[in-house]
């Protein structure tokens, strides 16, 4: 027997009107990124991007995609949604600059149980803020309302970045040699990896994560954990113009032990002195509260280093100078030696 519904799609849980409101509310945020080459209108079927290849011999497009992961649970708990979009952009653009690419454009994907226009607009505000920081145009996106699949007050967030680099300037890890030096770029915190462990350690579902914690300088656990992932685009691009960078690693899931070797050729490893690593207080607290062995910490988290850059030892001073001029408190982290160990922290 058939059933009769009025406004049947809405009764099924999908509110098209709310979707229209979301689009209208996010337009002001998207407009901030229009200066970076976006030539399309919000709501079109495809995002258009004006491509400037002047001065390039063989332009190569570089793409990257990622999400924010279970860090989103922190946003749900704190009901703060205007910064996770920065995380989404950061996770993508920080990856593509590892090959020397300049970000061009970005697209986001939001899937939710119920479309709350105000919340969606806040998420997109964060995405737009991240695009401004990375000088990327927000050329498109999708908001999928999926009742029965996600809880009403929860969502997932992912993104896709496209960049460009002249083929002759693509960074090649095979240029790394014994005796080269690793430069560290500090992270802003946990960034967007390891949150399944972090949430368990701090029991965030039950504990009060809004109260000040002395070990964190009076900040709350929630505030520190929700700090957006740092975007390294501007300082790295500035450095690429001044110094012959050999290789870059974005320190994400897998920490030092998984990511630094990705920037090294076979037969070479990184030697890092433990005392030289400027570990942030949040990681000391995680290790203490979770009774986590140090190797596991370095195999899970960035430990205060969000990106590593390998240069010749002759370029140390200039590299640090350029990075500091662009807001990065960079420092020498370690050296490259003949090894099959990948990373040795001693």
Ranges and model annotations:
Residues 20:
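Glycine-enriched loop-and-adjacent helix/strand subsegments that border the catalytic/binding cleft
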Residues 23, 121-124, 195:
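Hydrophobic face of alpha-helices
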Residues 67, 163-165, 187-191, 199-202, ...:
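Glycine-rich beta-alpha junction loops
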């Amino acid at each position: 027997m058939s059933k009769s519904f009025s406004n049947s799609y809405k009764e099924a849980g999908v509110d098209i009107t709310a979707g229209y409101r979301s689009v209208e509310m996010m337009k002001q945020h998207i407009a901030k990124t229009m200066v970076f080459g976006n030539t399309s209108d919000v709501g079109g079927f495809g995002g258009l991007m004006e491509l400037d290849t002047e001065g390039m011999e063989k332009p190569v497009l570089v793409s990257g995609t990622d999400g924010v992961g279970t860090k989103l649970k922190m946003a749900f708990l704190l009901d703060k949604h205007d910064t996770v979009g920065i995380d989404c952009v950061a996770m993508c653009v920080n990856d593509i600059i590892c090959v020397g690419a300049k970000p061009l454009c970005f697209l986001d994907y939001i899937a939710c149980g119920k479309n709350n226009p105000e919340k969606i607009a806040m998420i997109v505000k964060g995405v737009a803020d991240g695009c401004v920081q990375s000088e990327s145009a927000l050329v498109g996106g999708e908001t999928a309302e999926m009742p029965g699949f996600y809880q009403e007050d929860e969502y997932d967030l992912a993104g896709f970045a496209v960049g460009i680099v002249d083929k002759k300037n693509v960074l090649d890890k095979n240029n790394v040699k014994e005796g080269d030096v690793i430069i560290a770029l500090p992270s802003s915190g946990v960034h967007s990896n390891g949150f399944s462990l972090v949430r368990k350690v701090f029991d965030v579902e039950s504990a009060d994560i809004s109260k000040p914690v002395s070990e964190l300088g009076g900040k709350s656990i929630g505030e520190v954990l929700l700090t957006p992932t740092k975007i390294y685009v501007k300082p790295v691009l500035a450095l690429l113009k001044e110094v012959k960078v050999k290789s870059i690693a974005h320190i994400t899931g897998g920490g030092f032990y998984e990511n630094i070797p990705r920037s090294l050729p076979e037969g070479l490893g990184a030697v890092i002195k433990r005392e030289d690593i400027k570990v942030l207080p949040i990681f000391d607290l995680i290790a203490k509260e979770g009774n986590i062995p140090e190797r596991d910490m370095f195999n899970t988290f960035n430990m205060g280093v969000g990106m590593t850059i390998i240069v010749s030892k002759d370029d140390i001073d200039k590299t640090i100078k350029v990075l500091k001029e662009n807001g990065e408190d960079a420092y020498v982290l370690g050296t490259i030696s003949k090894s099959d160990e990948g990373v040795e922290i001693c």
